[in-house]
C-alpha cells in the first residue's frame, strides 16, 4: 500500500481537498466536500447519473467525444486515430479491451516510440469477461468507447505525472458543469 504522501498532490492542497476515510469500505479518498463520508464508488454509493445527467447539459456521443479530444488537444496532446478492435498486434488478447492495449507491449516496453507524446484517443473497446452482469448496472458493458489521454514517461524524460493528470481531469469535469463537491479522487 502506498503512503499518504504518495497521494498528497499539490493540486489537492491548492484546491482545498481533504483526505478522508470512507465509512463504508475503509478506503481513503480526497474530496472538497467537508460533509462527505463515503468515497463515491459503488457499492458505497449508488449510481446516480443514470437518468439524471451530472453535467450542465446532455451530450450526444459525438459531442462528448469531440469535447474530450478537443480539450486535451488544446492542452498539448496530439489527437490520434483509433486502433482496430481486433488486437492483431497482440498475441495475448484477441480484442482491444482498453485504450492502453493499443500501446502494449511495444510502446510501454520502450521497444518503439509512441505515435505521439502526450496523446489523446477515443478507442472503441470490446470486453466479454462479464457478460452475465451486462444490464444489471451501468458498469457492465460489452462495447464502449474509452476516451483517454496517455503520457509515456521515461527515466530520461517526464512529461507529467499524477498532479497534472488530476488537474486535467478536474478541469475537464468543471468545464462540463459537474458539481465540484461531487467529485472524489
Predicted regions and their residues:
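Structured aminoacyl-transfer and RNA-binding surfaces used for tRNA recognition/handling
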Residues: 49-185
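Short cysteine-rich clusters marking metal-coordination/redox-active sites
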Residues: 22-25, 39
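Cysteine-rich micro-motifs
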Residues: 33-47
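Short, low-complexity intrinsically disordered segments
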Residues: 27-28, 159
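Short, flexible, mixed-charge glycine/proline-rich loop motifs
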Residues: 9-17, 28-33
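Short, solvent-exposed secondary-structure boundary motifs
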Residues: 19-23, 169
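Long, compositionally biased low-complexity segments enriched in polar/charged residues
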Residues: 6-8, 67
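Basic, low-complexity terminal or inter-domain segments flanking catalytic cores
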Residues: 1-5
Amino acid at each position: 500500500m502506498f503512503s499518504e504522501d504518495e497521494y498528497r498532490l499539490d493540486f489537492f492542497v491548492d484546491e482545498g481537498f481533504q483526505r478522508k476515510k470512507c465509512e463504508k469500505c475503509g478506503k481513503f479518498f480526497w474530496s472538497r466536500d467537508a460533509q462527505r463520508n463515503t468515497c463515491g464508488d459503488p457499492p458505497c454509493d449508488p449510481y446516480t447519473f443514470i437518468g439524471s445527467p451530472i453535467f450542465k447539459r446532455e451530450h450526444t456521443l459525438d459531442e462528448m467525444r469531440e469535447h474530450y479530444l478537443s480539450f486535451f488537444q488544446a492542452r498539448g496532446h496530439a489527437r490520434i486515430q483509433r486502433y482496430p478492435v481486433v488486437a492483431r498486434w497482440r498475441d495475448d488478447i484477441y480484442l482491444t479491451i482498453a485504450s492502453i492495449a493499443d500501446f502494449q507491449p511495444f510502446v510501454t516496453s520502450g521497444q518503439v516510440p509512441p505515435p505521439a507524446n502526450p496523446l489523446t484517443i477515443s478507442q472503441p473497446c470490446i470486453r466479454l469477461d462479464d457478460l452475465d452482469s451486462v444490464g444489471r448496472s451501468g458498469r457492465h458493458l460489452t462495447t464502449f468507447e474509452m476516451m483517454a489521454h496517455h503520457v509515456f514517461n521515461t527515466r530520461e524524460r517526464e512529461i507529467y505525472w499524477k498532479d497534472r493528470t488530476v488537474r486535467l481531469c478536474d478541469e475537464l469535469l468543471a468545464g462540463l458543469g459537474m458539481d465540484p463537491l461531487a467529485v472524489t479522487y
